[in-house]
Amino acid sequence: MCKLMLFSLLFASALLAQDPGEKIRVIAFGAHPDDCDIRAGGTAALFARMGHHVKFVAVTNGDAGHQSEGGGALAKRRRAEAIESGRRLGVTYEVLDNHDGELLPTMTVREQIIRRIRQWNADVVLAPRPNDYHPDHRYTGVLVQDAAYMVVVPNICPDTPPLRKNPVFLYFEDDFQRPNPFRPDVAVDIDSVFMNKIRALDAHVSQVYEWLPWVDGLLDQVPKDPAERLNWLASRPEQPMGTALRQSLEKWYGPAKGAQVKHTEAFEVCEYGRQPGNDDIRKLFPMLGK
């Protein structure tokens, strides 16, 4: 192994060797104000419960995501919903003012993302994979990928100090198979905070009780009573847990506990950014089993 490669590996390992008392800083990017909550709300609640710092960023303002509302009024409503969801989870929530349905991987938006990662001094960055049915989701994945190296380059966005360590970038779980299926490198047991996640999603009234049921033809099934709505949301069918996801749970929590988990959130390590080993992942995701 050449000296330069050895030095790089030792340097990366040293940067990940965090003091047990040091707080982990996580930033998650979703295309719309509810995407982070859907894909990582439970994991965020666990981080927050342990005293770590989490920020959700919606890259668009959601001003197109409704069947009967739109524009500035809808964007204002969705921003308020996001802030309330963040309050319920114990995380910071920011909504960027880019139009819903019009997101492109431009330099302007890339710089917005680079600055947020730097300002948060992130250890972990979460985002969608760049293959998805929605162009905003795809381009959010591309934009975060494009920021993965640039966050340490001083001459890019020089108004914001560069990071001295590259974060670990991970993808949210999805069900898309092409060009390649999602790989659950990290699987988090969220059973203990499942209702925290549901209550956070409940804050996104315009989405979980109006827009998404309308899209799915289920609007007439949504209860009117707030308590019944919460129960309806919690009882919505989830995707069956596949073999790879169950194996990942058993890897991180042991066979006995891993076999019992009902609700989970999973993440795939991005090939860009820092490449963590198993010990590094346990440091960065301290809720995993020992």
Model-assigned labels for residue ranges:
Residues Q18-W120, V142, M150:
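Active-site rim/loop-helix segments in enzyme catalytic domains that contact anionic ligands
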Residues K55, T92-D174, F182:
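Internal alpha/beta domain cores that form substrate/cofactor-binding pockets in large enzymes
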Residues G42, N131, D175, G273:
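Flexible, active-site-proximal loop/turn residues at the rims of small-molecule/cofactor binding pockets
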Residues M1-S8:
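Sec-dependent signal peptide recognition
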Residues H66-E69, N180-P184:
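Short acidic, glycine/proline-rich loop/turn micro-motifs
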Residues S8-A17:
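Hydrophobic h-region of N-terminal signal peptides that target proteins for export
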Residues N61-G62, D174-F176:
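Short "lid" loop at the C-terminus of a central beta-strand within the Rossmann-like core
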Residues E22, V153-P158, L163-K165, F176-N180, ...:
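C-terminal accessory domains and tails appended to enzymatic cores
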